[in-house]
Amino acid sequence: MAADYWSSTQHQSWLFGREELAEARKVLGDAERPFIQQYPLPDLRLFNIYVNQQLIKLAKRLNVRQQALATAQVYVKRFYTKVEIRRTNPYLVLTTAFYLACKIEECPQHIRLVLGEARGLWPEFIAPDSAKIGECEFWLISEMNSQLIVHHPYRTLSELQSYLSLTSDEIALAWSVINDHYLTDLLLLHPPHVISVMAIFIAVVFKPNQHQVVSISGGSSATGALRDGSTNILSAFNDKTGAGMPAKVQRIVDWLANSDINIEAVIECTQDIVSLYEVWEQYSEKVCKEQIGRYVKSRGLDK
């Protein structure tokens, strides 16, 4: 087990460049071209939103803490960099990822209990056989090369709270943004500390509009606030004098300028979150469920 991120398998094996990640998905798509054409799926970000919402439903039924849920989201993301979605039953994959994450995060759940709750949520897609979860668990572990320890941005957020004098409201908003980043590719593209700094910046820069953003990710008012605020962040970094900048924002900008953190990466992450919230406005749970269910049933992946 790696005690720190920089010596971890997460840093060494599960951090991609954008082009590298796009190429990996293209290779998977080319190999499954007939099925992709036959069974269209929504935008990957919409698919991620749907999977995330199903995971949240399962976690609530079992009263599992956020970190285990986040680890499950990471497992699903990693798995789907190696396996094309249409080769799988996403309901079984997310159930198995959740079961495995609970073990790794030291809040284990009995396999039959997880199976029972999953069947309660998706009876038409989860077979009444716990061996299916066991088989899928082996598949996940194999595709992830047994590299199961995940470092999350929450720790950095907690460490910076007192140093940057963050209020409880700012911490709550930053936490919410971190939760939402698991719906994007950011967890495969940037280290956790960059994600945490991005979330802090959003929380502080958007403070006048935070009731819009924290209410829930993806609302149109939140999207507008974030879009406007991303311009504020760019202005903050480009303003060398700090004129007209709130004191806390200036302090964070100064701290960041004197750190080793990649400012361009923080800005890029902010733009990805804005993009997520824009896409979220198009989300329809009904459409996603129908499209996923169609290929799962047609290919017999629910058996």
Curated annotation (Swiss-Prot):
The keyword Transcription regulation applies. GO terms for biological process: regulation of transcription by RNA polymerase II. Pfam families: Cyclin_N. SMART domains: CYCLIN (SM00385). Gene3D superfamilies: Cyclin-like (1.10.472.10). One of its GO terms (cellular component) is nucleus. CDD domains: CYCLIN_CCNC_rpt1. Coiled coil: none annotated. Keywords: Activator, Cyclin, Nucleus, Repressor, Transcription, Transcription regulation. Residues 55-113 form the Cyclin N-terminal domain. The keyword Transcription regulation applies. Belongs to the cyclin family. Cyclin C subfamily. Component of the SRB8-11 complex, a regulatory module of the Mediator complex. Component of the SRB8-11 complex. The SRB8-11 complex is a regulatory module of the Mediator complex which is itself involved in regulation of basal and activated RNA polymerase II-dependent transcription. The SRB8-11 complex may be involved in the transcriptional repression of a subset of genes regulated by Mediator. It may inhibit the association of the Mediator complex with RNA polymerase II to form the holoenzyme complex. The SRB8-11 complex phosphorylates the C-terminal domain (CTD) of the largest subunit of RNA polymerase II. This is RNA polymerase II holoenzyme cyclin-like subunit.
